[in-house]
Amino acid sequence: MSDEWMQAWQPTIDVVGRDFSGGLESTAIDTIELGAVRKFLEAVELDCPLHYDAEVAKAHGYRNVLAPISGVSQTWLDAALWRPGLGSRYPSNHPHVDVPRERVTEAPSPPTPPTTVGFATDVEIEYFEPPVVGDRLTVRGRKLVSCTPRETRVGRGAFMVWEREVINQDGARVALIRNGGYSYVPFESSDEASSPRPPRPPAP
């Protein structure tokens, strides 16, 4: 059957909506600091008192100085490359040393057919409780939101979207982060594609 490769993704489709985090969470190494917010503003020259004046922020209904939401996905969630108690991440001065990583329990994976290549496709962030100075954020969950098998110009595979939740120290939801990606088996040649596109004409 020509659609056997699509049917191979049915077990993955069947588990859409399930969490595959294994209960793992990652908490930022630091609380959000006023100095860190200042440096964040400095790079983009953002002059808004909500981000540096606590009285102004509270007068507008916020708990404290607002941290720029663009830092939610990475900066305010930084778990640190090294912490006291860990061994050196650079045990050798060799320029190509394999930097050891902290061992953590591996999260489970959904049932998927074999693929050999993949790439990120999109990132979507939905914001809720604004993060403020003094908050310490945690990211948790790894829910499979969707799985869409599709043949593209590069191969056959599926587009999958994963969702993680960001909360603050009080358990309030700060954001939902959805990451999309395409996992596939590439065509060995363009002749394998069901509907190969003709080559583009040469530029004049």
Model-derived regions, located:
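Hot-dog-fold acyl-thioester-processing enzymes
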Residues: 2-122, 190-204
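HotDog/MaoC-like acyl-thioester-processing domains
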Residues: 1-25, 119-204
